[in-house]
Amino acid sequence: MEFEAVIGLEIHVQLNAPTKMFCDCPNRPGDRHNLNTCPVCLWLPGAFPKLSQTVLEKAVMTCLALNAKVQPVSAFDQKVYYYPDLPKGFQLSQFHKPLARDGWLEVAADDGTLKRLRIREIHMEEDVARLVHEIEGTQQISLVDFNRAGAPLVEIVTEPDMRSPSDAMEFLRTLRSQVRYAGGADCSMEQGSMRADANISIRPKGSDELNTKVEVKNMNSIRHVGDAIQHEIERQIRQYRAQETIVLHTRLWDPVKCVTVPMRAKFSGPCVPDPSVPDVVISNEWLDELQARLPEMPGQRHARFINQYRLTREEAILMSEEREVAEYFEAVVSKVQSPKLAAQWISAHLLPAIRDKGQSLMETPVTPARLAGLLCLIESSQINVNSAKEVFGLLFESDLAPEEIVEQHGLRQMTDTKELEAIVTRLIADNPVAVQDYRNGTTKAIGFLVGQAMRLSEGKANPKLVRQMIIN
């Protein structure tokens, strides 16, 4: 019997608002323990929460980026449960009246076609405090850090439309790109600003029944999400074939052993309306204003880059997935003749270099204007590719323009035909065997001869001109 998986995701995204959700404390969970606290986020009696307008705006922009229908009225509830990181005994969330419903994202399916995956709802939620485990003497103690308490979150709940680990991974990549474009969050799973839990069940292929699901947590990268889902699918299939009952519970992903392990029985506490936070009312006028502020989104940019710049699908994805990369690319393209050359240098040279140096595109000294200057030198045949790579490395160390670096280091390409003819005459005389091999039809011999010309010219010869001269 063949099986198929039924997968849904619950994704928590920490909004990059400057303050927490219900108070003016800085939204910086990584600061010194308990530095950013007040009576509201410490949940002291008598302290009343007030929803931040900036947080609401970031949340709505996130909903719009995910094609969700923002509700005219949403409301907060108290999600009741007891845990040391939640001393007040409830978490402010939106259960009965979420901020938005009926969103969707289109992702690339396993067969290369586009697949629409639905989002059931998006709701706002305050984050809880963080437990810090330390050793004091011979005992382990747990302390509570309230810096994270009250940090603004949105929870994105999908429909169970995914059928494979790759569906889930592509959904997360697309969501991350969309939300970053909208400016709502940085969505870094590695840094904890995006967390994803997966609900997984299996059924016979072709069936439409929804069987008992298992929740999997503790996945801190998109790759781990895919690995955890694949393992859980295989585990449930083994249980099914052994005629064991699959029970509703939560499991943790162990990235070292690459297995899921039982955590607890699945528990959902009661949710009751919160009396302290007024209903969130959103006007059509404000919604239209925010919609107009959305930038061109990744999918739109991807299609335009293919049509306008004649990039391949893969090149267009690389240049459009991140907003900063897309804007950098278009800034370079505005100054050069070949968009494909710009895309190739950004993907093959610039992005790996700044990653190795721990820089961002905003921080790198290789500005769009400087990279464009380098590419113009290649396009005009003033330098060859090897020299261009040398100049590129020097752009990180020098404030000089690419043209000045070329002059300072004597890297300008030899284009004088008399100089090149002298080199070609010499290498033909010095390499009679390679010349005869070429005349006998051994095409790789021409590559050897061009290489020898580059050696004789100390890398400054124009390889295209040298090749033409040898052939002629």
Predicted region positions:
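Short, basic interhelical loop/turn and adjoining N-cap
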Residues: 457-463
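Basic, nucleic-acid-interacting segments
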Residues: 1-296, 313, 334-338
